[in-house]
């Protein structure tokens, strides 16, 4: 998908003259449209389409500033998307993660208890989100409530864990 986006966004344009006596206003460094070179049109000679294409390639190509900004934006978004994708764990995968974090036997609860809790609260979905009637949200695998434990930018919330819910 990313390669298709890059292919669609690779907008190359032909170079245009820096200034032209017949054009009013500030000189344009790059034209975002396709045009024949001014040397060909000023000479009065007629060229075929293939001759124009060959000469256009020889003149060099430049990026349109709007295309550069669009490419930068798409690059930034493509870097951020994989980090925001939801992770849905398998039962064994979640058990390994919880064991690595030392939750087996934590406060008297076995690893099976933690896995059972995660299954029935979120279905092992790390991005699970449930809205309560009071406006608070239950977040993540263990459905931590934003009313007391985390902040979802609601004013006057205790935020005991001192972290954002997202």
From Swiss-Prot:
GO BP annotations listed: fusion of sperm to egg plasma membrane involved in single fertilization
Cytoplasmic side: 1-62
Low complexity bias spans: 16-52
Gene3D superfamilies documented for this protein: 1.10.530.10
PTM annotation, UniProt: The processed form derives from the membrane form by proteolytic processing.
Molecular function as annotated in GO: lysozyme activity
Site (Cleavage): 86-87
Keyword set, alphabetical order: Cytoplasmic vesicle, Disulfide bond, Membrane, Signal-anchor, Transmembrane, Transmembrane helix
Signal sequence range: none
Pfam families noted in UniProt: Lys (PF00062)
Domain C-type lysozyme as annotated: residue spans: 87-166
Gene Ontology CC entries for this record: acrosomal membrane; sperm flagellum
Cell compartment(s), UniProt: Cytoplasmic vesicle, Secretory vesicle, Acrosome membrane
UniProt entry tagged with the keyword Transmembrane helix: yes
Transmembrane segments: 63-83
Membrane topology: Single-pass type II membrane protein
Coiled-coil regions listed: none
Region (Disordered): 16-54
Covalent S-S links between cysteines: 150-165
Membrane-side (Extracellular) residue stretches: 84-166
Subunit structure: Interacts with ASTL.
PANTHER family reported in the protein's UniProt record: LYSOZYME C, SPERM ACROSOME MEMBRANE-ASSOCIATED PROTEIN 3
Family: Belongs to the glycosyl hydrolase 22 family.
Role this protein plays: Sperm surface membrane protein that may be involved in sperm-egg plasma membrane adhesion and fusion during fertilization. It could be a potential receptor for the egg oligosaccharide residue N-acetylglucosamine, which is present in the extracellular matrix over the egg plasma membrane. The processed form has no detectable bacteriolytic activity in vitro.
Name the record gives this protein: Sperm acrosome membrane-associated protein 3
Organism: Papio hamadryas (Hamadryas baboon)
Gene responsible for this protein: SPACA3
